[in-house]
């Protein structure tokens, strides 16, 4: 392969890349979100400067089922997002994400800054209950439940929930371990159609695990829940802060 051809490739292996080029379009992307109140001191230890926490110590536990994703296929994802602000702009800091699809993990980490790891989340309906679970290896890490489609949620309110700016850390070392890239990244979903949105009674259980430490942000009180069905396009990220520039 010519040098000029190598430089045009998106990733490795050269003849079987881990993921194709975007854009990445999601059809029937399903969200199950639970916003809960947690320990303020625990949040302060986690959220990186220059992001700022609000007065209310909140976390969004999110489950996402993505059965039809261009280039990436079908997968499910689970994570925690923390409401923050940057220079007065409100959004969510993406703390952890666990999913069951290698191409989605690779593209999320390489082309953006999504904090993705391998896990085994599931989102399903059990009788009259929407259920989300996360296993890390063979151990259960989280169980979320919500009454299935109890009360309709305003579609504009649902869109606002999904379209909040996301903030992420991009960290890549040099080959000797010294810092090479250390940036704060922002991305915001704008191309979206919300088909349905619901709310209902919800509960969330988190279990201690060293490698999936969701319970480091313990559940003190459930604030709200939502079940939202969408089509959307994944946005391109932008650098908003460089930790290595003095």
Swiss-Prot record:
SUPFAM superfamilies: Acetoacetate decarboxylase-like. It comes from the Bacteria. Pfam families: ADC. The keyword Lyase applies. It catalyses: acetoacetate + H(+) = acetone + CO2. Its EC number is 4.1.1.4. InterPro entries: Acetoacetate_decarboxylase, Acetoacetate_decarboxylase_bac, ADC_dom_sf. One of its GO terms (molecular function) is acetoacetate decarboxylase activity. The keyword Lyase applies. The active site is at 116 (schiff-base intermediate with acetoacetate). It is an enzyme of class 4 (lyase). Keywords: Decarboxylase, Lyase, Schiff base. Coiled coil: none annotated. Belongs to the ADC family. HAMAP family: ADC (MF_00597). Catalyzes the conversion of acetoacetate to acetone and carbon dioxide. This is Acetoacetate decarboxylase. The gene is adc.
């Amino acid at each position: 392969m010519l040098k000029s051809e190598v430089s045009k490739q998106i990733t490795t292996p050269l003849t079987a890349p881990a993921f194709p080029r975007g854009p990445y379009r999601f059809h029937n992307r399903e969200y199950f979100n639970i916003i809960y109140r947690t320990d303020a001191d625990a949040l302060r230890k986690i959220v990186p400067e220059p992001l700022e926490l609000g007065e209310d110590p909140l976390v969004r536990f999110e489950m996402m089922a993505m059965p039809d994703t261009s280039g990436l296929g079908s997968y499910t994802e689970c994570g925690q997002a923390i409401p923050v602000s940057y220079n007065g702009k409100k959004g969510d800091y993406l703390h952890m994400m666990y999913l069951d699809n290698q191409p989605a993990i690779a593209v999320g980490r390489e082309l953006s800054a999504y904090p993705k790891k391998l896990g085994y989340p599931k989102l399903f309906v059990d009788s009259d209950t929407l259920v989300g679970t996360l296993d890390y290896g063979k151990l259960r890490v989280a169980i979320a439940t919500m009454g299935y489609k109890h009360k309709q949620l305003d579609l504009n309110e649902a869109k606002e929930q999904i379209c909040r700016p996301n903030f992420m850390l991009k960290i890549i070392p040099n080959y000797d371990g010294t810092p090479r890239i250390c940036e704060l990244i922002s991305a915001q979903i704008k191309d979206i159609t919300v088909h349905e949105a619901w709310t209902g009674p919800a509960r969330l259980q988190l279990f201690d695990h060293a490698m999936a430490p969701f319970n480091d942000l313990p559940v003190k009180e459930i604030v709200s829940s939502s079940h939202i069905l969408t089509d959307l396009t994944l946005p391109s990220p932008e650098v908003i802060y460089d930790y290595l520039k003095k």
